[in-house]
């Protein structure tokens, strides 16, 4: 494509475009899976996703195969019979498969080194008749395949750009840009470079309606109306922060384009000694809450982790323990909620404000309740009663270790896991090998562009 930077062409030919051999290998596996599905006589097989649309980055061996059933089949039957067929297909190719759950269950399998999802759905005539969220995916594939000609390389550049910036993926942890969203943005703006030129000037809300057929209003900062379903915002998962990071990256790349914008950076773990030294230099206190990961998919657990972290932070703040930063991580076996506090010890007394004196009924109740207290008060200040009361928790660790954290809005599945088994760690003892990368990034927060600028040779 004319106008493309030389290093962009080198990236495409060397790192991003799948080789002919890789394409044929995956196509062969896909053909055999489709033949097995079609031979069952129960469903029709269809390859969807980036592999079907020819927009997959070299090395991303994720194959999405849909099992299309008659729309006359009851929903319950689709879940049971669809899962049974997907399981039998997987079993014919590999012993390495297991059930996963989204809106309804599907099978994930490793077939000859390829990560395969076997997903039952309805074979509906149009997107207007979808009965479940996955039913629209075949229409996405057809739409992009029909229109992406000449822009495939631009999609590959955008996907790698977003991956390197840490904003690729619509999962709950990332809250970023899905592959389908990347494809639609390239289509709408006509290429990678025109997209970045436009994104550098974005100011939310940004509304893109490719089909000019939006069927409702949306509140998200970035709105991209699905051209096959006017009721859906393809960018609904994109958080305000991820959108801002994309804008920042677009500006940075246009100002000083380089390969650094496409280089994926590793998450470097810290060691216990590093953590101890870091905490000593910062003068803050660190607490971790760990517990068994609830047996549900990320889309269910992660929002509850986010809610739980916020609720416990609010509890700490209300109790006088100022939270400087808090975050969460879902691991395969355990979860961690991490809290950095400005202060973690307080005096045994605290100030307690009562009602205004002229609120007679409540004022007299307050005075009567506290008048025999050995602590100062009640006294009048600015027209209302004030007294001193004993502080329930003088140490943040005692509060976090108490049943009080089960009474805040943690989310049902997280609360159940906490109720069975939770562990509170303090200071350098918060270090856990499985969370060492998470802990390191917790203390090295920087925007994507700042990370790139700091990594450039010669930059201080």
Curated annotation (Swiss-Prot):
Leading EC class: transferase
Any GO BP annotation: RNA repair
PANTHER family: CCA-ADDING ENZYME
Catalytic activity: a tRNA precursor + 2 CTP + ATP = a tRNA with a 3' CCA end + 3 diphosphate; a tRNA with a 3' CCA end + 2 CTP + ATP = a tRNA with a 3' CCACCA end + 3 diphosphate
UniProt keywords, alphabetically: ATP-binding, Magnesium, Metal-binding, Nucleotide-binding, Nucleotidyltransferase, RNA repair, RNA-binding, Transferase, tRNA processing
The protein's Enzyme Commission number: 2.7.7.72
Binding site for Mg(2+): 62, 64, 117
Protein's name in the database: CCA-adding enzyme
Protein's organism: Methanoregula boonei (strain DSM 21154 / JCM 14090 / 6A8)
Transmembrane segments: none
Family: Belongs to the tRNA nucleotidyltransferase/poly(A) polymerase family. Archaeal CCA-adding enzyme subfamily.
Highest taxon in the source lineage: Archaea
Cofactor needs: Mg(2+)
Binding site for ATP: 50, 53, 140, 159, 168
Function of the molecule: Catalyzes the addition and repair of the essential 3'-terminal CCA sequence in tRNAs without using a nucleic acid template. Adds these three nucleotides in the order of C, C, and A to the tRNA nucleotide-73, using CTP and ATP as substrates and producing inorganic pyrophosphate. tRNA 3'-terminal CCA addition is required both for tRNA processing and repair. Also involved in tRNA surveillance by mediating tandem CCA addition to generate a CCACCA at the 3' terminus of unstable tRNAs. While stable tRNAs receive only 3'-terminal CCA, unstable tRNAs are marked with CCACCA and rapidly degraded.
Other remarks in the entry: A single active site specifically recognizes both ATP and CTP and is responsible for their addition.
Lineage: Archaea, Methanobacteriati, Methanobacteriota, Stenosarchaea group, Methanomicrobia
Pfam families per UniProt: CAA_C (PF21133), NTP_transf_2 (PF01909), tRNA_NucTransf2 (PF09249)
MF annotations from Gene Ontology: ATP binding; CCA tRNA nucleotidyltransferase activity; magnesium ion binding; tRNA binding
Subunit structure as annotated in this protein's UniProt entry: Homodimer.
Annotated binding of CTP, by residue: 50, 53, 140, 159, 168
């Amino acid at each position: 494509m004319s106008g493309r930077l030389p290093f962009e062409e080198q990236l495409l030919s060397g790192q991003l475009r799948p080789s002919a051999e890789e394409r044929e290998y995956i196509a062969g596996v896909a053909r055999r899976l489709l033949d097995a599905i079609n031979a069952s006589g129960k469903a029709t097989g269809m390859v969807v996703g980036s592999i079907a649309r020819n927009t997959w980055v070299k090395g991303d061996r994720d194959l999405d195969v849909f099992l299309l059933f008659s729309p006359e089949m009851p929903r319950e039957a689709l879940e049971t019979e669809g899962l049974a067929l997907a399981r039998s297909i997987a079993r014919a190719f590999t012993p390495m498969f297991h059930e996963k759950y989204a809106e309804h269950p599907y099978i994930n399998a490793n077939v000859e080194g390829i990560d395969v999802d076997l997903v039952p759905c309805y074979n509906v005539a149009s997107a207007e008749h979808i009965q479940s969220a996955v039913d629209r995916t075949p229409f996405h594939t057809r739409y992009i395949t029909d229109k992406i000609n000449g822009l495939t390389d631009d999609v590959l550049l955008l996907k790698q750009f977003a991956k390197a910036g840490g904003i690729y993926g619509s999962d709950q942890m990332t809250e970023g840009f899905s592959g389908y969203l990347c494809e639609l943005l390239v289509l709408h703006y006509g290429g990678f470079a025109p997209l970045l030129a436009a994104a550098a000037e974005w100011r939310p809300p940004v509304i893109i309606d490719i089909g000019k057929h939006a069927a409702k209003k949306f509140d998200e900062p970035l709105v991209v109306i699905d051209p096959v379903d006017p009721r859906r915002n393809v960018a609904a998962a994109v958080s305000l922060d991820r959108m801002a990071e994309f804008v920042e990256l677009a500006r940075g790349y246009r100002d000083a384009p380089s390969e650094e914008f496409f280089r994926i950076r590793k998450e470097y773990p810290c060691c216990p000694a590093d953590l101890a030294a870091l905490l000593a230099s910062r003068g803050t206190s660190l607490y971790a809450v760990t517990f068994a990961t609830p047996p549900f998919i990320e889309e269910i657990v992660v929002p509850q982790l986010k809610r739980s972290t916020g609720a416990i932070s609010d509890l700490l703040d209300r109790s006088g323990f100022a939270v400087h930063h808090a975050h969460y991580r879902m691991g395969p076996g355990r979860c961690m909620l991490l809290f950095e506090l400005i202060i973690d010890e307080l005096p045994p007394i605290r100030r307690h404000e009562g009602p205004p004196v002229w609120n007679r009924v409540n004022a007299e109740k307050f005075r009567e309740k506290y008048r025999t207290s050995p602590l100062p008060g009640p006294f009048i200040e600015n027209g209302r009663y004030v007294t001193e009361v004993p502080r329930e928790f003088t140490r943040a660790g005692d509060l976090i270790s108490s049943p009080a954290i089960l009474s805040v809005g943690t989310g049902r599945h997280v609360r159940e896991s906490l109720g069975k088994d939770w562990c509170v760690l303090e200071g350098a003892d918060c270090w856990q090998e499985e969370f060492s990368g998470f802990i390191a990034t917790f203390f090295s927060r920087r925007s994507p562009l700042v990370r790139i600028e700091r990594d450039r040779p010669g930059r201080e």
